Amino acid sequence: MSKQEKYAGASALQGLSLGQQSAYISQYSPALLQPVPRSLNRDDLGLTGELPFQGCDVWTLYELSWLNARGKPMVAVGEVSVPAVSANLIESKSFKLYLNSFNQTRCDSLEAVQAMLVKDLSACAGSEVSVTLFPLAQAPHHIAALPGECIDEQDIEVDCYEFDANLLQGAAGNDEVEETLHSHLLKSNCLVTSQPDWGSVVIHYRGPRLDREKLLRYLISFRQHNEFHEQCIERIFTDLKLLCHPSQLTVYARYTRRGGLDINPFRSDWELPPTNLRLIRQ
């Protein structure tokens, strides 16, 4: 059974603006924000008690504009961090529509807009969300490279594009290492619309050495898989812990932007999130 079929009757997905024609409201409307319970996929992963990781979902906002007190348009770039312990993730299309609602709204200052975002996003997520807005001249603009070794250049024949955690069976070697690996070949699909989500993923771990071919095949198997960005990264973390037994693990993905937003989920049992620096595809 596909993830779409599995979640087809989920009440949490009913009424989402995602996949529907939407009116673009240009006056401030926090009611546009829509939460999705994280339990929707965490129950499936057995994550019903204390979480085995900490982390956050870091969003970058590229299309944010409002009017100042005199009616002149203002623009900024934003960084939002939603804690992984929050009850809900924030549905991305509703986030975009919410940001658009600032377009014809008069606000006294950048700080006032930032405070509105903190209040509304925290209410949607069910936990305190941090927001930083940058005037364009102060916005981070460096294009970064992922840390560690890329596993994408392996010359392998691939024929499995349906998600299969069993591709990690036997991926844990005998020698203990600490290493960082990354791949740019992560691709999954939106749970509701099946639109492609393109990402790059970093895996930093201590424990039995990972078989890089098996790891790459596993990551490629997400190619026809339907789940939200955040859910995919928690699935990768959980599968690696269960099947490869690292003593310490970080899984961090950076997805390409859609609708002026990019989502960058970070999950770890031993590290804090890195600086939010975009990749070449972002």
Curated annotation (Swiss-Prot):
Molecular function via GO: preQ1 synthase activity
Catalytic site positions: C190 (thioimide intermediate), D197 (proton donor)
Record's signal peptide: none
Keyword Cell membrane annotated: no
Database matches in InterPro entries: GTP-CH-I_C/QueF, NADPH_dep_7-cyano-7-deazaG_red, QueF, QueF_N, QueF_type2
Residues involved in NADPH binding: S92, K93, R258, G259
One Pfam family in the UniProt entry: QueF_N
Reactions the enzyme catalyzes: 7-aminomethyl-7-carbaguanine + 2 NADP(+) = 7-cyano-7-deazaguanine + 2 NADPH + 3 H(+)
Annotated GO biological process: queuosine biosynthetic process; tRNA modification
Membrane-crossing segments per the record: none
Function as written in the Swiss-Prot or TrEMBL entry: Catalyzes the NADPH-dependent reduction of 7-cyano-7-deazaguanine (preQ0) to 7-aminomethyl-7-deazaguanine (preQ1).
Protein name per the record: NADPH-dependent 7-cyano-7-deazaguanine reductase
Phylogenetic placement of the source organism: Bacteria, Pseudomonadati, Pseudomonadota, Gammaproteobacteria, Aeromonadales
